[in-house]
């Protein structure tokens, strides 16, 4: 005999349909849209920072007054 396993869902439970009003529903959807856009923009900023940091350091270093060699710009010392 195989025992049935049940999955318990963690997180906030959805409110019942009778207790929600249209104003709270619209506020909830506005919050969700704001949250989605915030997460999307932060992910894009993270990727841009990840791939743009080293080229930025190289550009700033090459525009400095005593022009260093590329090796000096890339070395951590």
Swiss-Prot record:
* GO biological process: one example: protein import into mitochondrial matrix
N-acetylmethionine, modified sites? 1
Q: A GO CC term? A: mitochondrial outer membrane translocase complex
Its localization reads:
Mitochondrion outer membrane
Where do Low complexity bias regions lie? 16-30
Keywords linked to the UniProt accession: Acetylation, Membrane, Mitochondrion, Mitochondrion outer membrane, Protein transport, Transmembrane, Transmembrane helix, Transport
* TM regions (residue ranges): 47-64
Q: What is the protein's membrane topology class?
A: Single-pass membrane protein
Residues on the Mitochondrial intermembrane side? 65-77
Q: Which residues lie on this side of the membrane: Cytoplasmic?
A: 1-46
Q: Where is this region: Disordered?
A: 1-30
Its tissue distribution reads: Expressed in roots, flowers, young cotyledons and leaves.
Q: What induces it?
A: Up-regulated after antimycin A or rotenone treatments.
Q: Which family does it belong to?
A: Belongs to the Tom7 family.
What does the record note on quaternary structure?
Forms part of the preprotein translocase complex of the outer mitochondrial membrane (TOM complex) which consists of at least 6 different proteins (TOM5, TOM6, TOM7, TOM20, TOM22/TOM9 and TOM40).
Briefly, what is this protein's role? Seems to act as a modulator of the dynamics of the mitochondrial protein transport machinery. Seems to promote the dissociation of subunits of the outer membrane translocase.
Q: What is this protein called?
A: Mitochondrial import receptor subunit TOM7-2
- To which species is this protein native? Arabidopsis thaliana
């Amino acid at each position: 005999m195989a025992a049935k396993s049940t999955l318990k869902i963690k997180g906030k439970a959805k409110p019942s349909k009778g207790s929600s009003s249209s104003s709270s529903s619209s506020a909830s959807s506005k919050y969700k849209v704001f949250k989605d856009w915030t997460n999307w923009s932060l992910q894009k900023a993270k990727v841009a920072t990840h791939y743009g940091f080293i080229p930025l350091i190289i550009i700033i270093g090459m525009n400095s007054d005593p022009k260093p060699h590329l090796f000096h710009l890339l070395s951590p010392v």
